[in-house]
Amino acid sequence: MTDRLTQLQVCLDQLVEQFNATVNYVNTNSEPGLLDEDPSSVSNLAANAPIPGVQQQPSQGSGGGSNKQTNAGNSVSNQPSAKAEAESNFENTINELSTDIILKSRQITMLIDSLPGIGVSPESQLNMVEDLAKQLEEVEKERIKKIEEKDKLLKWCESLIVEVATGISESRE
């Protein structure tokens, strides 16, 4: 397990990645909006200009006039439902991304709250460190005792094995 500062750094890195992914998603998938109130301003015209390299759908068909009307009728009737579905999908994705950012922010807040801060005096922090050092010494002593006990049990088992092996070899003679 890592310490709280490392966890905090990892969470902050993840939050930055989430912000970046969210902004990228919005830039890629959202409808362009007006930059100012005048729809005929240069900035709005530039923002709504066609993207170079993207082919526009041809408005003329190769068939007769009646074919144009049926194609136009189909595209008009299919377009609103597709657009509504795309907007719904966009909104759902934005809600998901927003929820992820909120949860990560709360996790960061919890990590920050768990750090010793302004409300903890340096003396109390030193006392806490000293208490932890004493606990560590006690645990280390207990570990050494257990290692010595293990070594004694191992020697006892070895002596039992030697006695059994000696007894078996003497009984065969």
Curated annotation (Swiss-Prot):
Keyword terms, alphabetized: Activator, Coiled coil, Nucleus, Transcription, Transcription regulation
Main location: nucleus
Sections of the chain in a coiled coil: 123-155
Pfam families listed in its UniProt record: Med21 (PF11221)
Biased composition (Low complexity): 50-60
Recorded GO MF terms: transcription coregulator activity
GO cellular component: mediator complex
Region described as Disordered: spans on this chain: 30-88
Biased composition (Polar residues): 67-81
GO BP terms in the entry: regulation of transcription by RNA polymerase II
Domain of life: Eukaryota
Cell compartments where the protein resides: Nucleus
InterPro entries noted in UniProt: Med7/Med21-like (IPR037212), Mediator_Med21 (IPR021384)
Stated role: Component of the Mediator complex, a coactivator involved in the regulated transcription of nearly all RNA polymerase II-dependent genes. Mediator functions as a bridge to convey information from gene-specific regulatory proteins to the basal RNA polymerase II transcription machinery. Mediator is recruited to promoters by direct interactions with regulatory proteins and serves as a scaffold for the assembly of a functional preinitiation complex with RNA polymerase II and the general transcription factors.
Family the entry assigns: Belongs to the Mediator complex subunit 21 family.
PANTHER family assigned to the protein according to its UniProt record, in alphabetical order: MEDIATOR OF RNA POLYMERASE II TRANSCRIPTION SUBUNIT 21, RNA POLYMERASE II HOLOENZYME COMPONENT SRB7
Quaternary structure, from the entry: Component of the Mediator complex.
Protein name: Mediator of RNA polymerase II transcription subunit 21
